Each structure stands twice: as C-alpha cells, then as structure tokens.
Amino acid sequence: MFLHILCLLAGQALADDYRPVFHFVPEKNWMNEPNGLIKIGSTWHLFYQHNPTANVWGNLNWGHATSSDLVHWTHEPLAITSENGIEAFTGTSYYDAENTSGLGTSDNPPYLAWYTGYFPSNGTQDQRLAFSIDAGETWTKFEGNPVISAAQEAPHDATGGLETRDPKVFFHADSGKWIMVLAHGGQNKMSFWTSVDAKRWSWASDLTSTQVPGLPSAVKGWEVPDMFEVPVHGTDKTTWVLIFTPAEGSPAGGNGVLALTGSFDGTVFHPNPVNVSTLWLDYGRDFDGALSWENLPDSDGHRILAAISNSYGANPPTNTWKGMLSFPRTLSLHQSQTGQYFLQQPVSNLDTVSTPLVSVKNQTIAPGQVLLSSVRGTALDIRIAFSANAGTVLSLAVRKAGSQETVIQYRQSDATLSVDRTTSGLTSYDPAAGGVHTAPLRPDASGVVQIRALVDTCSVEVFGGQGEVVISDLIFPDETSDGLALQVIGGTAVLRSLEKFPRLGAVL
C-alpha cells in the first residue's frame, strides 16, 4: 500500500511538469542558486535567485521559502526585490547579535542580508544591504546603499567593478570585525573586505589561483563563495573552509563546487595545499552555487549545505519552472592518517517521512540474478552495503522501463562509483545532459562498500561510503519508467544490508 501511494504521488508530480516529490522548486518560473540561507528560531529560511515573471534568467529577485524540517517548504513573498533598474543578485545573511549595524535595537537585533546590485543597463555590479527586524519575515533595503560601490571596487577588479559579486559575510569574533568575501568571476580570485558596522567596508586582501598550492590550472571562473570555521573531527582543532563554484574544471565538466581548507587571521586566508582527491564536493553535473545555512549551534559539528541542481540554464524540459534545490546535506571535516577529508550525508530529517519498504541482509548475489525487479518507485531512498569479489561490478538501475534506465554502478577493479545517464530518458535538451560521471570510492577497512541513492522525479543524488563522494545529476525519464534492478557482473557480491524507503507525501 505504501508503494502504491508513493507511485501515485510521484506520478502526479511527473504529470505536473516533472515536479519533484521531496526537493524544493519554485511555484513557477526561474530559480538559480540559493541565497542568504539562515535558521531563525526553529525556522529554516531559504532565499534564492528568482525571476517571478518568466522561466528564464533575468529580473532577479530573492525568492523566499521557509521550513521546519528542510523537507516540507512553504512559499513566501519575495524578500528582496528588483526595482529601479537594479536587480538583486546572489548574497548571504547573518544575525547581527550585538546590533553593530545600528539597524535594530539591543532588545531586537537585526538580521542582515548582503547582496549584489546588478544594473542590466551597463553591467555594473555593487554590493548592497537589507535588514529584517521581524525574524526574517520581511526585509528593508538599507537607505545608504550601496555599501560597496563600483568605484570602490574598481581598484581591486580588473573590469572596474563589472565582475565583483556574490558577497559572503560573517562576523569574525577574534578580530571583532565583519568579513566580506567577494567573487571576481573570470579573474579567478576572491577579495576580502572588513567592516566594524557591516555598512562601511575596506579592502583587506586578495586570494588568487597562484596562492592556492596544487589547485589544478583547469579550475577557472570563481563564483559564489562560502566561508566558515569548522571542527576537525578526530582532533581538538578547528580550521577554516572556503567553498566556491568554478565555471570550469570540475570532474563532470562545467560548473562544480570545491572546498579549500586553511587558516584565516581576519584579513588573509592562507589555503592549505590542495589534495585533488578530496577537493570536489560533488562529482555530478548538477550541484552548482552551494551555500550553507548560518545561525546553527557550534555543537552540531557540521554545516548544512544546499546548491542549485541545474547546469543547463533554461534548457531542461520543464515548462512551468526551472531550477531545483539539491536535497540539503550535512558537511563535516575529518582527520585521517593521510590527511583531511569531508563527509556529506542527506540531513536526517528525511528519515521522518519514510517507511521501510524492502530490507535484505547477508544475501549473496551472483551473475544472472536480478533483485528488486518487482519493485516500483520514482521517489526513493535506497541504501546498500556490500562486499564484492575481485572483478565484480555491482549495478543498480533506477527509473527503469524497457531500454530506459539510470544506472548507478560500483566497479571493484578500479574502486569507482558512477552514474550513467546515457539511456536515462530525455537528454537532447543539452549536449551535457547524458554521459557517465565517476568518483573514486574505496571500501572501508572491513571491505564493505556503502551506497545511498536519493531518487526523485527528475534527479538522482548518490552518496558513496560514509559520504566521502557524492554524484548529483538531473534525469528526465518517462512517467512509466519506475522500475529497479540490482545485479552483478563478473563476480559475486554479498549484500550486508539493503534498505529501500519510499518518500511519503509531496514537499509543498
């Protein structure tokens, strides 16, 4: 019965223009990267780049949605609007707990949001401020905008202020100052600015590709910075993390999201040498412009991250909406004998809307056997743990019917995890919409490989191991492609555990 209800819900979502069941999408029209992610009280706030009047990029405002669990979302009115010929580009939010900005009171400190003001008439970009004194429900633009003008940017920007955007702002307690990180796109650099009141800013330093030891030369076009301090699990230390989205050089081609670690003294970020094997936060094509939620307790020991799942502009075959939020994931940093590495997992709130559907333990699967062929579903959470003989390929096909399928595969011979979209459904909308995306994934110390696949109406997000690697891809299969098949090639595998959960209920 649960599966039947799920298939009906997922079918309704697909019939409604590929709308997902448990991922956020706008009610209508265009969405790109998330903005200003912040938790206020028990409410998660999602702001995002949004064109409310058309299904293409342009006329960008801050869309707004709220949630109590990061699974179910409520659409809210626009937060920061495009007006007077100035669009509201990407930015971030932060709680001004001490009211250093003077935009609230000591009894009711404000929430602040910095964003890039974009002038379509001439391409100018400057930095602007808005504030909220009603817990993020409504936002007022600062009357002294811009807080950093294009003229002020010009000495630090090769284009004279035409390519300075995406402010990431946080309060740095050790220096007692606000820090702003700005991206400079094709110049492959970030600039760092400081302020004592969140309104008046001074340039402090630049970070360029030549200052990042070991950064591959193919990584170009730096966009959408995020920066924060996290504990290093396995030690008693903390470190700083700088995330950004390069336009080129990612494992799957096109935009990708990488993370640098290092130290920060309030003025200069000093990056550690890059370990290419742990550089990328996603090996798929569709994880772009990632940001993390602010105002979480330090005791959590992790950040919660989300990105836009779309690297094809207006090309995907959705007619009433464009752009989907990746499912929120935790991000934590760990220390091993060989170095530091990140782990990512879907937020645990997903478990609260799931009911176990299939459970298998300690079963050997040999070539010729096909498991799960009688199971149907288009919105699923599949978790597999297995050990494989030499030369074994374990293959999990999802959204399968006839010749159509998306194949998640693990190859023992070269220890790789992959997602194959070659026959996943509609791919003609963009030259990059098909193909195979691969990530390195070694078994754990006991020889067990773990795979977790989140499957929704038009996406797969595959987490390998404890979350050492992730592959996120959009897919557009037929509505009737709802089958699964689990099999092995070239050897046997022992399924230590297999669990399959349906997603119960739509997101919105």
UniProtKB/Swiss-Prot annotation:
UniProt-listed InterPro entries: ConA-like_dom_sf, Glyco_hydro_32, Glyco_hydro_32_C, Glyco_hydro_32_N, Glyco_hydro_beta-prop_sf
Enzyme Commission identifier(s): 3.2.1.-
Coiled-coil positions: none
GO biological process: sucrose catabolic process
CDD domains to which the protein is assigned, alphabetical: GH32_Inu-like
SMART domains: Glyco_32
Keyword Glycoprotein belongs to the record: yes
Organism superkingdom: Eukaryota
GO CC entries: cytoplasm
Signal peptide range: 1-15
Keywords linked to the UniProt accession: Glycoprotein, Glycosidase, Hydrolase, Signal
GO molecular function terms attached to this record: sucrose alpha-glucosidase activity
Residue positions with a glycan: N99, N122, N275, N362
Family stated for the protein in its record: Belongs to the glycosyl hydrolase 32 family.
Protein name in the entry: Putative glycosyl hydrolase ecdF
